[in-house]
Swiss-Prot record:
Entry keyword annotation includes Chaperone: no
Active site: 154 (proton acceptor)
EC number: 1.-.-.-
Organism name: Listeria innocua serovar 6a (strain ATCC BAA-680 / CLIP 11262)
Keywords linked to the UniProt accession: Oxidoreductase
Binding locations of substrate: 141
Family annotation (CDD domains): SDR_c (cd05233)
Gene Ontology MF terms in the entry: oxidoreductase activity
InterPro entries per the UniProt record, alphabetical: NAD(P)-bd_dom_sf, Sc_DH/Rdtase_CS, SDR_fam
Descriptive protein name: Uncharacterized oxidoreductase Lin0452
Entry similarity comment: Belongs to the short-chain dehydrogenases/reductases (SDR) family.
Length: 248
């Protein structure tokens, strides 16, 4: 197993997919650096991990701020001497029709879903290039693969993540940096994403969908662990993951 003793940063780690991934990777022996804005939730997750003899620290992090991302990577290197992988998982999904003109929410999605990923990449890339190894994993969405009414801006941000990660993979191969990438496209996974939707009609429709088909975040955690656990000369770069019963 290649996860044991790997130093792994997780953003958006305070709930949902991030929390589930942290718990699973800790069980497999990873050394974790957890990041999110909600410190009280991070504290509880770290306590849970340590109670099971796992190893984890946390840092309050706003992924929209470049300096926060840089400090996060610096913390990991200061504490553990290196970073082996980063899981860029922070995101929001305030879906609504374009005609609702929720421009502030559009901007928030762009800042967190796109710039947050870019900031994470920029923060970790120098150390990965220097050590000629590293693994960058990002959460996109099936919304980045298939359009649907109400998901225009969210889908656009997740398509951007898809393109960023694919070009990063190509450039890493060309430059010989040995940096691996993986992009995950979840469908209906039961997380707090629905709580970010303020458009009532959209929220009701998405809630009904998730009630019918949604599965637990640990399903995605196992995919992240699988990607990290592959040999260094193998790059499994895309995972589309959803409930068996969901027609999408």
């Amino acid at each position: 197993m290649t996860i044991k003793n790997k130093v792994i940063i997780i953003t958006g780690a305070s709930s949902g997919i991030g929390e589930a991934t942290a718990i699973l990777l800790a069980e497999k022996g990873a050394k974790l650096v957890l990041a999110a804005r909600r410190v009280e939730k991070l504290e509880k997750i770290v306590q849970t991990i340590k109670a099971s003899s796992g190893e984890a620290i946390f840092a309050k992090t706003d992924v929209t701020k470049r300096e926060d991302n840089k400090k996060l990577v610096e913390l990991a290197i200061e504490r553990y001497g290196k970073v082996d992988a980063i899981f860029l998982n922070a995101g929001i999904m305030p879906n609504s029709p374009l005609s609702a003109l929720k421009e502030d929410e559009w901007e928030q999605m762009i800042d967190i879903n796109i710039k947050g990923v870019l900031n994470g990449i920029a923060a970790v890339l120098p150390s990965f290039i220097a050590q000629k190894s590293g693994h960058i994993i990002a959460t996109s969405s099936v919304a980045g693969l298939k359009a649907y009414p109400g998901g225009a801006v969210y889908g656009a941000t997740k398509w951007a993540v898809r393109d960023l990660m694919e070009v990063l993979r190509m450039e890493s191969a060309q430059e010989g940096t040995n940096i691996r990438t993986a992009t995950i496209y979840p469908a209906a996974i039961n997380t707090e994403l629905l709580e970010t939707i303020t458009d009532k009609e959209t929220e009701q429709g998405m809630t009904n969908l998730y009630k019918q088909y949604g599965v637990t975040p640990d399903r995605i955690a196992s995919i992240v662990a699988y990607a990290i656990d592959q040999p260094e000369d193998i790059n499994v770069n895309e995972f589309t993951v959803g409930p068996t019963t969901q027609p999408w």
